[in-house]
Amino acid sequence: HGIEVEEERVAEASVELPNIVQAYGEALPYPDDHFDLVFSNEVIEHVDDDRRTAAEMVRVTRPGGIIVAFAPNRLYPFETHGAYFGGRYVFGNIPLVNWLPDPLRDRFAPHVRAYTMKGIERLFVGQPVRLVHHRVIYPGFDNISARHARLGSLLRRALYLAEHTPLHVFGLSHFIVLRVREDAAG
């Protein structure tokens, strides 16, 4: 099962994957307690209401089930979704945008959120979940590796080592795992 907001993409995906539906994260079209596992990969930063989307993820996960989510890290030195400069969108990894104060960052990147450690966890406050694991992880550098194998390998090895040091806070994404409480039947 999966959701997508764009109808054309649902049609494309449905050729190979029959259970893709058009829906928004804030209103998942599934009954309560439906899934053993809910997986969200770099999506929650794009929705209109991230707290509502987090609540929906919990709602459709059965008691004892797992939620796995990845979301952008506010301390990563690049905004990976591009940014707006003078009303013009610039695609790519834009340095230091995420390190700006909120009002400035939101002017350059109004189309996407990036989360602090506490900020991503705060989305699930008041929900019947227990935090199982939360780390910040570095990227795999697949695109660089495809063009420059040695450089990609060097970056990957060095930064994967950084994940086990205080430098992990500067990684690309939050990797968060939550378990829905057994007493949380919807």
Indicate where each model-derived feature is located.
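S-adenosyl-L-methionine-dependent methyltransferase catalytic module, highlighting the catalytic core
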Residues: 48-56, 66-179
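Generic C-terminal helix-cap and adjacent flexible tail
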Residues: 180-186
